[in-house]
Amino acid sequence: EWSLDEQVTMIAQAGFDGIDISAQHPDESRAARHLMRDAGLSCTCYAFPDSVSGFQRDVDLALELEAQHLNLIIQIFPVSVSEGVDVIGRLLEIGRQSGLPLTVETHRNCITTDLLYTLQLMEGLPDMAISADISHYVVEREFTWPVPERDEAWMQQILARAVAFQGRVASREQIQIQLDFPQHQGWVSKHLQWWEDGMRHWRAREPADTKLNFLTQLGPPPYAITGRDGYELSDRWQESITIMNWVREIWQRLEKNSKPEQR
């Protein structure tokens, strides 16, 4: 197990620009942020708000940590769309009043668990900024292969609204699959296409001086699949570097192919 200091050093030396840290563990996050400043790394934060009344604490910590934005995995579970719109609207208003950009992540076991419900939330909240972790919907909807046109159209709506992205590759039954296994290459290619589509939407919409955050998010077990011996079947650290390089290649290709007036 690497120490916090070792982790920050490795991340900086590998060429990453920043780290996403938790608003749930203030002391650990403050310690990490101190090391990140010394290493020249920027910061985003994530939180799991389970009430509107307690959300200001998450916002205050993210501001203290100088987070570029606070990403929300909202642990409030309304049944109706109108209730969901009300809850998220109140959270977004707290962010606005505090001057902190907020994103709402597409994630299972939270308010955006269901793809179709999330699309309705987006319609009711035109100013809701999406952080797109599309792997969750691949599993949640159990997309068949090849992905049907109907499901592709739904996914494109998510990508068109995304202001940030999170990178792991899923299959219809597994949330995080190994990147170099031959049997996974169809899903790898599909996620690369989705990320490129999302970044193309973003570039067409956002001002030229806006920063796009792409988080290489590869979770430990049980996200990571393990063998009988309990050890993971791939090296998540090396896979995170692989995803970083893929995303930068996509960005450079989009940059090269864009017209000067577009950016």
Ranges and model annotations:
Residues E1-L63, A67-Q68, I241, N245-R263:
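N-terminal pre-domain/capping segments
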Residues Q7-T9, S29-R33, F55-D60, V85-L92, ...:
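Generic structural signal for well-ordered alpha-helices
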Residues E1, S22-Q24, Y46-D50, Q75-F77, ...:
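Active-site beta-loop-alpha junctions enriched in small/polar residues
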Residues Q97-P182:
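Acidic/histidine-rich catalytic cores of soluble enzymes
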Residues I19-I21, L41-A47, L70-L72, L102-V104, ...:
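Hydrophobic faces of well-ordered beta-strands that scaffold small-molecule active sites
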Residues M122, F181-R200, P222-I241:
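Short, electropositive alpha-helical surface patch
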Residues S42-I130, V139:
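Active-site acidic/histidine proton-transfer and metal-coordination neighborhood
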Residues R150-A153, W187-K211:
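A short, acidic, amphipathic alpha-helical segment used as a generic capping/interface helix at domain edges
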